[in-house]
C-alpha cells in the first residue's frame, strides 16, 4: 500500500488512465474488425470511405503510446494493400 500522499494520488490517476487506455484500445480494435469485415464482404466503396477514419484512429492510439507507431503504420499499409487488391 502506498505510504505517501502523492503515491496515493498516483494510484488514483493510474486507475483512471488505465480505463481511458482500455477504451481507446478497444475502439481501435473494433475499427480494425469493422474494416476486415468490409474487406471480407468485398465492399470496396465502403472500405475506402472508412479508411481515413481508421487511419485517424490508429494514429491517435500510436501517438498516445497505446500501440507503437510502426505497428499502426504496418496495419494501415496492409489494409491499404488489401483494399487496392479488391
UniProtKB/Swiss-Prot annotation:
GO biological process: translation
Organism domain of life: Bacteria
Cellular component terms per the entry's GO annotation: small ribosomal subunit
Entry's Gene Ontology molecular function annotations: small ribosomal subunit rRNA binding; structural constituent of ribosome
Family annotation (Pfam families): Ribosomal_S20p
Keywords: Ribonucleoprotein, Ribosomal protein, RNA-binding, rRNA-binding
Cited NCBIfam families: S20
The protein's role, per its UniProt record: Binds directly to 16S ribosomal RNA.
Similarity remark: Belongs to the bacterial ribosomal protein bS20 family.
PANTHER family xrefs: 30S RIBOSOMAL PROTEIN S20 (PTHR33398), SMALL RIBOSOMAL SUBUNIT PROTEIN BS20C (PTHR33398:SF1)
Protein's name in the database: Small ribosomal subunit protein bS20
Source organism of the structure: Pelagibacter ubique (strain HTCC1062)
Organism taxonomic ancestry: Bacteria, Pseudomonadati, Pseudomonadota, Alphaproteobacteria, Candidatus Pelagibacterales
Gene designation: rpsT
Amino acid at each position: 500500500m502506498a505510504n505517501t500522499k502523492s503515491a496515493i494520488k498516483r494510484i488514483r490517476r493510474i486507475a483512471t488512465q488505465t480505463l481511458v487506455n482500455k477504451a481507446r484500445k478497444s475502439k481501435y480494435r473494433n475499427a480494425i474488425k469493422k474494416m476486415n469485415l468490409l474487406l471480407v464482404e468485398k465492399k470496396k466503396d465502403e472500405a475506402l470511405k472508412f479508411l481515413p477514419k481508421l487511419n485517424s484512429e490508429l494514429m491517435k492510439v500510436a501517438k498516445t503510446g497505446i500501440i507503437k507507431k510502426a505497428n499502426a503504420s504496418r496495419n494501415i499499409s496492409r489494409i491499404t494493400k488489401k483494399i487496392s487488391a479488391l
